[in-house]
Amino acid sequence: MQITSGLPTGFNPHDYDMIVVGAGYAGAVCARRLAETVGFRVAVLERRDHIAGNAYDYYDEAGVLVHLYGPHIYHTFNERVHEFLSRFTEWTDYQHKVLANVHGTLMPVPFNHKSLLLAFGEERGEELYRKLVDTFGENKKVPIMELREKNDPDLQEVADYVYENVFLHYTMKQWGQTPDQIDPSVTGRVPVFVGDDDRYFPQAPYQGMPKDGYTALFENMLEHDLIDVFCNVDARDLLTIDDGRVLVNGEVYGGEVVYTGPLDELFNLDMGDLPYRTLDMDQFQPVGTVNYTVSEDFTRITEFKNMTGQVLPGKTTIMKEFSHAYVPNSGQTPYYAIIDPDNRKLYERYLERVSSVTNFHPVGRLAEYRYYDMDAVTYSALELSDEIISCHA
């Protein structure tokens, strides 16, 4: 692998069998698989000055390994994903835990047996927990919106408490919408856990942190003689879609294109922009992440050395996250797609414009306008690369 800032003089896209736009999970996975499986020469074009996408991490002045774009916690149920990523990193045994600061009391999130006892006291908390067990069984995740629909006064009491103190205000801060306006695929990610396990991902068999960090993982993944990486390159300056064809520097490009950027930006927002939420980061607590679910302006604080396992006496780095609406072409980072029927229809209109381009493959959270965990986007890229490989094997 060679990483270059900008495109060299005389760059010829036709020297490459595949162009990948974006050096995050989706792009890096596809680049690696096509290079090593069918011998594709691959050019990876990355708009930012670094690889690894939003998983990028670096050592700050205090020596703390910081996730620049907010905390990324690896977890998966998918054995194929885990085996693939494990080729490029060893893992530390990190089990992520999150606390919610509810009016000064720190409670485990997802809301669980321990949270019930803290919120309602020992006696009432146990009564409510038995009702949850009788209704749903132990070690079950129950989405908060499903719990609210139960016609039972005890379950309604739990639902109302969690909704008001853990879910409602945090959700409005993060998304700028009320829960009933938010797509169920998002609200379903906020469950009540009927059990005592206070890990954030209690049932995921594979979880941890890359031993040397995420950036090192990506460096290893992209380390291949047939892969060239060009940072500080905006693919929109050379790549266009016209009449069912991919043009690069105005000429038809016959190789494969894996595109992981926003589709609306590829077309200069000519049908309108797809809304996102973005985060401002403002760079001492018992766990890696504390969610502030009630009154504070920020959504959460992360203390990174609690996640990386670094021992740095007297030194720490925290990050506060403030969520607000994303402004396209402003230099902000689009984090969370605001998925609702209107936005979905707009995305489908953009997607239709590339659907007939057989060598153009949109993949990833931006290109698919989805809320993606790291393991899910990795799996999506593995499946896409399977399809491309099958056409060239």
Question: Residues of each region from the PLM?
Answer:
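A short, basic/flexible loop-to-alpha-helix module at the beginning of a structural domain
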Residues: M1-H14
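N-terminal Rossmann-like FAD-binding beta1-loop-alpha1 element of flavoenzymes
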Residues: Y16-V44
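Glycine-rich FAD pyrophosphate-binding loop
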Residues: A35-E61
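Mid-domain catalytic core of redox enzymes
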Residues: T37, D237-R353
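Short catalytic/ligand-binding loop motif for oxyanion handling, primarily in non-cytosolic enzymes
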Residues: A52-N54, V102-H103, M107-P110, L117, ...
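Dinucleotide-binding Rossmann-like beta1-alpha1 core, especially the glycine-rich loop
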Residues: A62-T135
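Active-site/ligand-binding neighborhood in enzyme catalytic cores
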Residues: H103-M107, H113-G255
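C-terminal catalytic lobe of FAD-dependent flavoproteins
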Residues: T333-A393
